Amino acid sequence: MDTNDDPDEDHLTSYDIQLSIQESIEASKTALCPERFVPLSAQNRKLVEAIKQGHIPELQEYVKYKYAMDEADEKGWFPLHEAVVQPIQQILEIVLDASYKTLWEFKTCDGETPLTLAVKAGLVENVRTLLEKGVWPNTKNDKGETPLLIAVKKGSYDMVSTLIKHNTSLDQPCVKRWSAMHEAAKQGRKDIVALLLKHGGNVHLRDGFGVTPLGVAAEYGHCDVLEHLIHKGGDVLALADDGASVLFEAAGGGNPDCISLLLEYGGSGNVPNRAGHLPIHRAAYEGHYLALKYLIPVTSKNAIRKSGLTPIHSAADGQNAQCLELLIENGFDVNTLLADHISQSYDDERKTALYFGVSNNDVHCTEVLLAAGADPNLDPLNCLLVAVRANNYEIVRLLLSHGANVNCYFMHVNDTRFPSVIQYALNDEVMLRLLLNNGYQVEMCFDCMHGDIFGNSFVWSEIQEEVLPGWTSCVIKDNPFCEFITVPWMKHLVGRVTRVLIDYMDYVPLCAKLKSALEVQREWPEIRQILENPCSLKHLCRLKIRRLMGLQKLCQPASVEKLPLPPAIQRYILFKEYDLYGQELKLT
């Protein structure tokens, strides 16, 4: 039908225009609030004082001065505004009768009308008096709230009933199209919801996000309101603008009774929102354990696969270890990877649930996932690198004990000849030794082209120096440790770090570049003394045993305990004398 031929549509359009103009005028008045009022007269001050003190005889005398009724204070309050927020009905009637009708809709500087002030004050009789005198019941305050919405927020059934009897608009939208019905559902006031519906309230109203009162009741976990709305025609299958179902909202609220009720009336756990998330994802992320128990059996594996992420990811992201345990008990795979389109939405391109736990510094979730068999080496940016950079010793210890690759590389950040993880531990001996004790390839830190294994310096060709003055080809192809550690802003660490590294080697081939940097460090005399003397046979045997065992067994305490060796020797093989973190926790 052509909208030009629809009289109802024309009426609504005209009404909208009228309201828009009125709101613009009131907004401009409020903006100029301080300038629109003149200094108060003595009669006005006496009149206001009589209102506040409840002195009726004096008030009856002062209201004869009409000019005093038309004066407002610095807050924009006229005597009528003062009268509506005091409890004596007779005082309000006197002031109301003495005021011009044009003042009945005047707003304070805060944008409140006499009616909205009376409603906020919870004075039902004052509200009734204003309405009976003919005050318009639908004028919003400057926050966009109608008197009805304010009454619902106050939780006053009598106030709501009074407004309805005086023809207030039940479905009038407020800010973001939020209505009185939505607010009643949010507050869990079944009696007010029933009252609104009885007088023609719309159960299918949508707020600015497309959410119905049914969705609001589900989100806030009000099962009795939810059931009442369903019985009155609420659509269980309604979707919000973002595609969220009513069941999705209930999953966010976490009330298992609401979820059970929605499932009973046809709600589906397999309807994703526009982001692809299912109700089970929402419950797992929010940590709603009981809700999750309801959703696991009603959510299909195919729907989860299509979503691109598992509830395991959601629970880890939300740091909810109890939900993780429940999901693992129900057969969810801790090593399922995020879909590529989701992974690529993160700067680090994370893929595993374990990565979420590690990046959140969540020791408990990390422990739960690793105990369930999570592989710490599946992400493009290894979880160990993230934990070391965050300086989280316990997560680093957990990852290493469950097979994290201590010799991993992250080539997107820095193309180094040596394994990347040590970069983040150079200024922390506790972390550095934690990595070295667990098999870090320390020899790679001394592998470069600046000299041979006998310490003879390597002379670069003049052609290379001409092409890249001050640089060498190995810096371009893969940056050796000696180049990395001797840059001006890290040079102060070279002595301390090298002193730690040589505890884990048999022969240390110092190149000319590294040696020249060390010679000016205070650790150099000690380092030189160590290098000039042969290693102890005990230490050489330790290194040989570690190489024969392999990294995987070394990181598993149970494997070492099976060796036919006394505990003291086992501890020596594991470099326990250098386990500073374990000593702090009394683990060694």
UniProtKB/Swiss-Prot annotation:
Pathway: Protein modification; protein ubiquitination. SMART domains: ANK, SOCS, SOCS_box. It holds the Pfam family Ank_3. Residues 524-579 form the SOCS box domain. InterPro entries: Ankyrin_rpt, Ankyrin_rpt-contain_sf, SOCS_box, SOCS_box-like_dom_sf. Keywords: ANK repeat, Repeat, Ubl conjugation pathway. ANK repeats lie at residues 110-142, 143-174, 176-208, 209-241, 242-274, 307-339, 349-380, 381-413, 416-444. One of its GO terms (biological process) is intracellular signal transduction. GO terms for cellular component: cytosol. May be a substrate-recognition component of a SCF-like ECS (Elongin-Cullin-SOCS-box protein) E3 ubiquitin-protein ligase complex which mediates the ubiquitination and subsequent proteasomal degradation of target proteins. Belongs to the ankyrin SOCS box (ASB) family. The SOCS box domain mediates the interaction with the Elongin BC complex, an adapter module in different E3 ubiquitin-protein ligase complexes. This is Ankyrin repeat and SOCS box protein 15. It comes from Homo sapiens. The gene is ASB15.
